[in-house]
Amino acid sequence: SFDSLIPTELLDESFDPTSEQDDRVSDLRYIKLSEIAPDPDQPRRAFDEVSLDELAASVKEHGVLQPIVVAPDKQGYKIVAGERRFRASQRAGLEKIPALVRTLSSQHKLELSLIENLQRSDLNPLETATAYLKLRDQFNLTLEEIGQRVGGKTSAAISNTLRLLRLPASARDAIVAGDIREGQARPLIGLPESVV
């Protein structure tokens, strides 16, 4: 099924993952799913099961239409971008997935992963806030720089999203569960847990 979507002459299965060259894009290749692991630093914590099942059905019928991006590590590869496609491919019973292998510094890998996920619209507000916090604290980016890298958000919008991390735990849980929206939670910032 991959062969009909991606010409096999573009695939390179001889990539050397021990290369130290930073920010190198490899040729497109198939990689065994068993050699790939999710990145524990990825901002997305929850995956919608129905959406994954739908994507898996599409992968079964049409193949993986967009390669994932991975970086080599000691055990194989870590996902930089495309964890949903990876999980859907597992559910679809695929053995290999098309992937671009990029050799990146750990900082660049985390930054790309965070930005790729932030550019998607389906992160919950707390996942977004946590990703902004990592970009600010680990990479010393200003709010303006974060806004530019994630698609033109204003510094004020970034700041307001970061404030959600100061919510009481019960309010954060309600946002993640979808029981309340971000705007409904804002007045609760700074209140003690016992009041909420």
Feature map (PLM): residue ranges:
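Amphipathic alpha-helical extensions and coiled-coil-like segments
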Residues: 8, 123, 127-145, 149-196
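Switch/connector loops and helix/strand junctions flanking conserved nucleotide-binding motifs
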Residues: 107-110
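Short, charged/polar connector segments at secondary-structure boundaries
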Residues: 1-102, 113, 119
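Residues at structural and domain junctions
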Residues: 22, 41, 45, 75, ...
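Short hydrophobic/aromatic-rich motifs at helix boundaries and adjacent loops
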Residues: 26-30, 56-60, 101-105, 115-117, ...
